[in-house]
Amino acid sequence: MVGSAFRRIYPDAESPTTEEFHNGLYDAKGKHIVHLAAKVGGVKVNTEEVGEFFRMNSIINQKLLHMAHHSEATKVVSLLSTCVYPDAPYITYPLTENQLHLGPPHPSNFGYAYAKRMVDVMSRAYRQQYGCNFITAIPNNLYGENDNF
């Protein structure tokens, strides 16, 4: 939903080819990147294609952060999803960021959720090793136009 809302605001924004993506990031010196890219789907496809959701989203995340690091982008904000949080009994409400890695995510989003968790881990690792200003944010659940459940 965040991505489709972004496209409504910026209708000329489109998914670039790998080469355009690569060249665009290398030219992004001094710019901020908001990472919204992801393979997404409803519960049915998420449970049927668990490995594919993990693989594709892991590739997207790894390429983007690696290229952003080498482009010397000044900041990357990667959006996660509330599905990254584990279920009870691992958490208490209200949810806090320190509960993110306390247990497995719900099986209905397993591959997607773990890939999103890994972008958080990777952002922390790049920040620790290279001093990159890479952070993650978890927007609250939304309901509305373009929701797919």
Feature locations, PLM:
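Adenosine-cofactor binding site in Rossmann-like domains, unifying the SAM/SAH pocket
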Residues: 8-28
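Conserved beta-loop-beta element that borders a ligand/cofactor-binding pocket
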Residues: 80-81, 120-145
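Conserved cofactor-binding/catalytic machinery of classical short-chain dehydrogenase/reductase
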Residues: 32, 60-63, 75, 118-119
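SDR active-site strand-loop-helix element
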Residues: 33-39, 76-82, 137-139
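Active-site helix of classical SDR
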Residues: 111, 115-118
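N-terminal Rossmann-fold NAD(P) dinucleotide-binding loop
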Residues: 3-4
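NAD(P)H-binding glycine-rich loop region in Rossmannoid oxidoreductase-like domains
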Residues: 24-57, 67-70
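Conserved Rossmann-fold NAD(P)-dependent oxidoreductase catalytic core, especially the SDR/UDP-sugar
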Residues: 62-109
